[in-house]
């Protein structure tokens, strides 16, 4: 690999609103998300707890965009892996800039936990080995597949890896 640098963003946060999905002329899906990440700390002078929230614009493409539009809702917790991009445009003679996290087919969008307003029937499977179970986690070995390999048309509110589904991985290690 002859990369001159690394451009990788990892976020774990909650959606500020429902995803906005649109389709571009070639038929591909594009979803826009607003993801909030927060950090909290104790103020050394006052002893009060403080919190700072950052809002991130996330753009998903392809099947990931379709899955986000179908299953993600405001308040849902998500894990995002993508690339940071800044684009510019002209707005009546004023150059405007926006920085976004792009999640292409090589990126990852993983649903974590459940949204606060969901009922008990839509709860995810419990965590195993500290890893949340989602459509990106395979049954064997906890190996992770890329988001583009997920199946978008699953009837459950939050898709889970079907029991017994074979992804072509073997438990036999050749060494």
Swiss-Prot record:
A Pfam family assignment: SSB
Gene Ontology biological-process annotations: DNA replication
Any single Gene Ontology cellular-component annotation: nucleoid
Key words, A-Z: DNA replication, DNA-binding, Plasmid
One MF term in the entry's GO annotations: single-stranded DNA binding
Residues covered by region (Disordered): 114-175
Ranges of biased composition (kind: Acidic residues): 163-175
Regions recorded as binding DNA: 55-61
Low complexity composition bias: residue spans: 115-136
Positions of the SSB domain: 6-110
Assembly and interaction partners: Homotetramer.
NCBIfam families assigned to the protein according to its UniProt record, in alphabetical order: PRK13732.1 (NF010292), ssb (TIGR00621)
HAMAP family: SSB (MF_00984)
Purpose: May contribute to the conjugative processing of DNA. It has a functional relationship with Psi (plasmid-mediated sos inhibition) proteins.
Identification of the protein by name: Plasmid-derived single-stranded DNA-binding protein
